Amino acid sequence: MSRLACISSLFILCAIGSEAVFTQSAGVKGVLMCGDKPLANTKVKLYDDDTGPDLDDLLAEGTTDSLGQFLLTGHTSEVMTIDPKLNIYHDCDDGLKPCQRRVTFNIPKSFVSSGENPKTFFNIGTINMQIEFESESRDCLHR
């Protein structure tokens, strides 16, 4: 019985320790424009892109400020290195079409940090969202 208790305790300690070891974070910042005007109050979300039946983990969300600027940071615990991505939901040059344009940018793994706070931020720079991105889609859920 004591052998089983030792093995169980060791398993629990390993499980608790693995959470701290594999906590990872990412951060992204940038400026969104619509032509020559800042794209203010635009929804931006930072996800860990998971494959398979596992849903993507929302790490952070926010909106751009009056100058079109945003900064997001988030963290999660995973066994493997996280795959951060930025989703932008906007109506720049969209006319009267329903829902919003959704554009996704994958963040390089070199910007993933261990721990809850990112050591570096991925700076996407200034992007004119008038561009029609090849991979963009429409989204009616994330206003």
Swiss-Prot record:
Compartment(s) of residence: Secreted
Signal peptide coordinates: 1-20
Expression sites by tissue: Expressed in head cells next to and anterior of the first pharyngeal bulb, the pharynx, and the hypodermis.
Record GO cellular component, one term: extracellular region
UniProt main location, coarse: secreted
Keywords tagged on the record: Secreted, Signal
Coiled coil segments of this chain: none
UniProt cross-references to InterPro entries, sorted A to Z: Transthyretin-like, Transthyretin-like_sf
Family: Belongs to the nematode transthyretin-like family.
Functional summary from the UniProt entry: Protects dopaminergic neurons from degeneration caused by oxidative stress.
Protein name (Swiss-Prot/TrEMBL): Transthyretin-like protein 33
Biological classification of the source: Eukaryota, Metazoa, Ecdysozoa, Nematoda, Chromadorea
Gene name of this polypeptide: ttr-33
